[in-house]
From Swiss-Prot:
Keywords: Coiled coil, Cytoplasm, Cytoskeleton, Meiosis, Nucleus. This is Meiotic coiled-coil protein 6. Residues 202-212 have a biased composition (Low complexity). Residues 175-234 are annotated as: Disordered. Residues 66-188, 243-297 form a coiled coil. The gene is mcp6. It is found in: Nucleus; Cytoplasm, Cytoskeleton, Microtubule organizing center, Spindle pole body. The keyword Cell wall biogenesis/degradation does not apply. Interacts with alp4, kms1 and mbo1. Residues 175-199 have a biased composition (Basic and acidic residues). It comes from Schizosaccharomyces pombe (strain 972 / ATCC 24843) (Fission yeast). GO terms for cellular component: cytoplasm; meiotic spindle pole body; nucleus.
Length: 327
């Protein structure tokens, strides 16, 4: 606009201009006008082109600025997200560092415990080896005691059978003595002179025939008494020796007492073994329980002797009255 105003002012007629030649000045003025118009047109074109270029450049710059702003905003967001990620990673690293320190401390403690467990394992291995040796020794002892127990059981059975036989023989002899005494009482003497003598003989026979040894030199009178009456049915078939029977019974009692003592000692040994093997393997406990069951099932019975002979004999010749109480 300023250029147009200047051009209009320049194109206005100047009243102060005095031309030397009117024709030349008019033509020159026209050419000058044309040139000035053309110049202004070119200038306006140039200005408009430059204005358009400037506007384009301005728009481009604005787009670039907007793009830069968008890019900077995006970059800012990315930076913020990266900063947050870095913060999270730092926290994770700190947590991992703490966890690694805790793990290292735990590892050190576990190494110490492992060393202590190795020492304890060696001690327990040595102890288990000693226990195995002791178990083998105890097993041998148990086998020995088992064999002894079986032998003692067999001895108990044999002694029980012999005791039964002895009781039967004693009862048989007692019944025989009673029968013979009754038969002797039923026999009548032939004359009065032999009556007293027969009574004495019968009394002596009832007292001494199953008990005295008629073959001994001290009992010669009794030998003559037995030979007086050959028709007498009383003949001693078996010599009864009370002292020998009593000694035999006492020996049996001692034997049974020894067997009971052995049985009690064996029970005590089994109790000791059970106390020792409380913390041992189940196999040994099963064997020990089997031994205890064998002891319970095969315990020797308690034998009691009740052989009593309380018959009092009448004194004959030099024989003193004897009270045989075999208890």
């Amino acid at each position: 606009m300023e250029y147009q105003e200047e051009a209009s002012l320049a194109s206005a007629e100047d009243s102060t201009f005095i031309a030397s030649s009117p024709v030349q000045s008019v033509s020159e003025m026209k050419s000058i006008k044309q040139k000035s118009f053309q110049y202004f047109d070119d200038y306006e074109k140039n200005v408009s082109d430059k204005t358009i270029q400037f506007q384009k450049l301005q728009m481009t710059a604005k787009e670039i600025i907007d793009a830069f702003e968008r890019d900077s905003t995006q970059r800012t967001l990315q930076i913020e997200s990266l900063e947050s990620k870095i913060g999270e990673q730092e926290r994770d690293l700190n947590n991992e560092k703490l966890a690694s320190e805790t793990l290292r401390e735990k590892t050190q403690l576990l190494e110490k415990e492992n060393g202590a467990l190795k020492v304890e394992n060696g001690y327990l291995y040595e102890k288990s080896r000693k226990l195995e040796e002791e178990m083998a020794h105890l097993k041998k002892k148990c086998n020995v005691y088992k064999s002894k127990f079986e032998e003692s059981s067999l001895r108990c059975k044999s002694l029980y059978s012999s005791n039964t036989k002895l009781k039967d023989s004693m009862e048989t002899m007692k019944r025989r003595m009673e029968t013979e005494t009754k038969e002797m009482n039923k026999i009548k003497p032939k004359n009065d002179s032999e009556s007293d003598r027969f009574k004495r003989n019968s009394q002596s026979l009832s007292q001494q025939s199953p008990l005295l040894d008629v073959h001994s030199p001290d009992n010669s009178n009794h030998r003559t008494m037995l030979n007086i009456n050959n028709s007498s049915p009383i003949k001693p078939k078996k010599i009864f020796k009370p002292n020998e029977v009593k000694n035999r019974i006492s020996r049996l009692q001692k034997t049974f007492a020894d067997l009971e003592n052995q049985h009690h000692s064996f029970q005590q040994i089994c109790q000791t073994l059970r106390k020792r093997l409380e913390n041992d393997s189940s196999t040994t406990k099963q064997r020990l329980s089997k031994l205890e069951e064998i002891i319970r099932n095969r315990a020797p019975p308690s034998y009691s002797f009740s052989l009593n002979c309380s018959h009092t004999y009448q004194p004959v010749s030099c024989v003193e009255p004897v009270n045989h109480d075999l208890s």
